[in-house]
Design a protein with these regions (language model features):
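N-terminal organellar transit peptides
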Residues: 1-79, 83-87, 95-229
């Protein structure tokens, strides 16, 4: 395909973006689909960075993308800068390392479907949802090491995680740090040093302006004041 929806090549780094709804098919090429994803990924090798901001979508489509990333030859660094909800959280579990912005969120819940028909059809839909849930738990279990029961309960409650909770529960490995932080710290250190040197210079100058006789005279005055009291 000529239009590269996912890939952005800069500084010889393989940077991929999953931004939008995850769907099996897309009419306007504005959704994240396995077909489009695979066409961009299949000829690439080495380490890649995947930025994720998605409310989720089709769980089967997400499963296919998850598997592609899991099978990728190279490290897969997942960076969540906005939202990784529902099916998008499953994709995130394929990361060799998962990092979240301090303001980003992750959400996991039970799979949903729409069914029409009699009681037998409804039962089929319910059975299908149970199996889909078990497959999703597989991805969460591999990443977090939590028990299947724990994960199931979290999904039942539609659980939202900020980056701290996600790290605590094992869904995330660390925090996206501000690249400007080190620069700020360095500047602050030099600023403090400059201020300290400036103060020391000023103090030294003030000390030098007073002779020993002047200092002795001041001490005598202080002593006399105390004796008068």
């Amino acid at each position: 395909m000529n239009k590269k929806i996912f890939w952005n090549w800069s500084n010889n780094e393989n940077v991929l973006y999953i931004d939008g709804v995850i769907a099996e098919d897309s009419w306007f090429d504005d959704d994240v689909t396995p077909k489009l994803f695979a066409s961009e990924l299949k000829n690439k090798s080495g380490d890649i960075t995947v930025w994720v901001n998605s409310p989720g979508g089709d769980c089967i489509a997400a499963s296919r993308i998850y598997t592609m990333l899991l099978e990728h030859k190279g490290n897969v660094i997942i960076k969540i800068d906005g939202l990784a909800a529902s099916a998008a959280s499953v994709i995130a579990m394929a990361g060799t390392e998962v990092l979240m912005s301090p303001t980003s969120l992750m959400m996991i819940h039970n799979p949903l479907t729409v069914a029409i028909g009699d009681s037998k059809e409804m039962q089929k839909a319910m059975d299908m949802l149970k199996e889909v849930k078990e497959s999703i738990i597989n991805a969460y279990e591999i990443k977090t090491g939590l028990s299947r029961e724990e994960i199931s309960n979290l999904m039942d409650g539609e659980t939202w995680f900020d980056k701290n909770k996600a790290i605590e529960m094992g869904f995330c490995d660390g925090t996206l740090t501000d690249r400007r932080k080190d620069e700020k710290v360095t500047n602050m250190v030099f600023s403090r040093r400059a201020v300290t040197n400036s103060l020391l210079t000023k103090i030294n100058k003030e000390v030098k302006t007073h002779s020993m006789s002047e200092v002795e005279e001041r001490l005598k005055k202080i002593k006399n004041k105390w004796e008068e009291k």
